[in-house]
Swiss-Prot record:
Its EC number is 2.4.2.48. GO terms for molecular function: pentosyltransferase activity; RNA binding; zinc ion binding. Substrate binds at D126, A192. This is tRNA-guanine(15) transglycosylase. Exchanges the guanine residue with 7-cyano-7-deazaguanine (preQ0) at position 15 in the dihydrouridine loop (D-loop) of archaeal tRNAs. Belongs to the archaeosine tRNA-ribosyltransferase family. Its cofactor is Zn(2+). One of its GO terms (biological process) is tRNA wobble guanine modification. It is an enzyme of class 2 (transferase). It comes from Thermococcus onnurineus (strain NA1). SUPFAM superfamilies: Pre-PUA domain, PUA domain-like, tRNA-guanine transglycosylase. It catalyses: guanosine(15) in tRNA + 7-cyano-7-deazaguanine = 7-cyano-7-carbaguanosine(15) in tRNA + guanine. The keyword Methyltransferase does not apply.
């Protein structure tokens, strides 16, 4: 039986911090798998585990075709062969197929071999179609890949990759992704993209990734095959990539190449190391240049691994802080082709908006003209226009232009920084209710202002800002200090439930979860049976049963589509239940 779980813990842009568990072993994503060549170990798997790499990838085809490795792997298993107790993923020989045109093994043979040697995550023998291949070849390769996927699905007894192919034809990528999503696989790599990255065709890479993501199930992690340079991590994660692999740490080291988050330097160019990893803290560039080749290669490989790990941590911290777009913007300026890819990504507004959180831990900073195209800005402008029809009194915002006056206390309008300051005016007692009604219309959708038309709004004695919202002695909502949006009380939730037709704002849970939700307990993904597809990450939602009876209110971590798909992890952090 396959033991595999994936859940989302935090998110920003289309990126996410997740927890992946396979066979009782856990890693946090985004994660990178250092590539291990069992014939040539620059850094041992055991050392990689000590450095914090909880997952590695090696090539099952090389092991299969090397008699001594094959015999030992069959005898003791791949974990003992490599002396590594973390998660081991394997490729199938597809890379050799793309590079050299052929492999001497069948799909069934390699899948069965992977299971026999005890890998954690296997890969069937897909056909990687290189970029710009003739359409007919891409279609035929994909037909064979999907046939092999079906065969692998029928015989597999381990967690398995199902790679999305289709060359540089977006429609084929989306088609492949949809077909594979219908099958029983655990992870979806996006394959045959190394040639795009090697030739700096990052703009085309964006098209391939987004086309694939649009067809894939959102509850499965996505692996960008062959992507291991830190300069691309922020952009790739913002697109929705969860897993990477890198042979570059060792291959570059052999050529005296030194990785940085902004690009690659040759050791001969460096007088100073711009890094404080254990290698760069101990040696100077000159000292490394004077070392024997083998020792120098090993130390450069270690540095490259440290900088890869550091950049992934930087990306994860940016997600936690709601700053991933700022990091993407910064990294994109390290190369013109990466900058072009960043601009291309911002053209996919529909895809990005569905994954963009409704609120963030950090203020919006206008750091570039491109930042005005971030989905949080585009959404805010669109919603403000809708609110303006009901609350026509406007003020001029230096970043967002003309906005309804009564949204001026709320995210992202109040929590933003540009070249010019935006002065926030404290609301007067006579108009403070309008602020609440306008924010409801902005946050919950058209018509929801009616739920607060008789509200009494308490102002903070300290700041003069709206805080508690009540009506007829009952608590409706809280006007949050951190972002000027509303957290619903159960009475406010009841009013919205009466106003809004099903399924708006709803998360429907099954009978098992119902008594817990009523008592204010969190809702987990496996108990969700339906949801409003317009729900966005960190939205306030109404939790109901199959009969649309209100059970609770809370904040969701997932968007509407994800709520219906995920089977692991937290779905809604419940704030109030009808019985508590």
């Amino acid at each position: 039986m396959v033991e595999f779980k994936f859940e989302v813990k935090a998110r920003d842009a289309a990126g996410r911090i997740g927890k992946l568990e396979v066979n009782g072993k856990k890693i946090e994503t985004p994660a990178i798998m250092p590539v291990i060549n069992p014939k040539q170990l620059t850094v041992t798997p055991k050392e990689l585990k000590e450095m914090g790499f909880g997952i590695i990838i090696t090539n099952s085809y090389i092991i299969y075709k090397t008699p001594e490795l094959r015999e030992k792997a069959l005898e003791v298993g791949i974990h003992r062969l490599l002396d590594y107790d973390g998660i081991i993923e394997v490729d199938s020989g597809s890379f050799q197929l793309m590079r050299y045109g052929g492999v001497d093994v069948t799909n069934r043979e390699i899948v069965e071999f992977q299971e026999r040697i005890g890998v954690d995550i296997g890969t069937f023998l897909d056909i990687p179609t290189p970029p710009d291949a003739p359409r007919e070849k891409a279609e035929e390769d994909l037909r064979i890949t999907l046939e092999r996927a079906k065969e692998a699905e029928e015989i597999k007894g381990i967690a398995m990759n199902a790679a999305v192919q289709g060359s540089t034809y977006p429609d084929l990528r989306t088609y492949a992704a949809r077909k594979l999503s219908e099958m029983n696989f655990e992870i979806h790599p996006i394959g045959a993209v190394v040639p795009l990255m090697e030739s700096y065709r990052y703009r085309d890479l964006v098209d391939v990734v987004i086309a694939s993501k649009q067809g894939l199930r959102s509850d499965r992690p996505v692996h960008l095959f062959g992507a291991g340079h830190p300069m691309i991590f922020a952009l790739a994660v913002a697109m929705g990539i969860d897993l990477f692999d890198s042979a570059s740490y060792a291959l570059y080291a052999k050529d005296d190449r030194y990785l940085t988050p902004e690009g690659t330097k040759h050791l001969s160019e460096l007088e100073y190391f711009p890094c404080s990893c254990p290698v760069c803290s101990r040696y100077t560039p000159r000292e490394l240049r004077e070392m024997p080749k083998e020792e120098r290669t090993r130390l450069l490989a270690l540095h490259n691994l440290w900088v890869i790990r550091e950049e992934l941590n930087r990306v994860k911290q940016a997600i936690k802080e709601g700053e991933l777009w700022r990091l993407v913007d910064e990294r994109a300026r390290s190369h013109p082709k990466l900058y072009a890819a960043y601009k291309r990504l911002l053209e996919y507004q529909d895809y990005l908006e569905k994954n963009e959180p409704i609120t963030k831990a950090s203020a919006f900073f206008k750091v570039s003209e491109e930042s005005l195209k971030w989905p949080i800005v585009q959404r805010a402008k669109a919603r403000a226009e809708r609110v303006k029809a009901k609350f026509p009194e406007t003020i001029n915002h230096p970043i967002f232009g003309e906005i309804p006056k009564y949204l001026s206390l709320s995210y992202p309008f109040a929590q933003s920084e540009g070249e010019e300051d935006f002065t926030i005016e404290k609301p007067g007692k006579r108009e403070v209710r309008n602020y609440v009604m306008a924010v409801a219309e902005y946050q919950f959708g058209e018509g929801t202002r009616e739920a607060f038309k008789d509200a009494f709004v308490e102002l903070s004695r300290k700041t003069g800002m709206p805080r508690q919202i009540k009506a007829k002695g009952k608590h409706l909502a809280t006007f949050r200090a951190e972002d000027g949006l509303l957290t619903l009380g159960i009475e406010g939730a009841k009013r919205l439930h009466e106003i809004l037709p099903f399924p708006r704002m709803r998360v429907v849970v099954d009978e098992d979860a119902e008594p817990f939700a009523r008592k204010g307990k969190n809702v987990f993904a496996k108990f969700v049976i339906d949801a409003d597809e317009n729900i966005r990450p960190y939205d306030e939602v109404l939790i109901v049963n199959r009969n649309d009876e209100l059970l609770a209110t809370g904040q969701t971590l997932l968007n509407g589509r994800e709520l219906k798909l995920f089977q692991s992890g937290l779905a809604v952090k419940v704030r109030r239940g009808v019985e508590k």
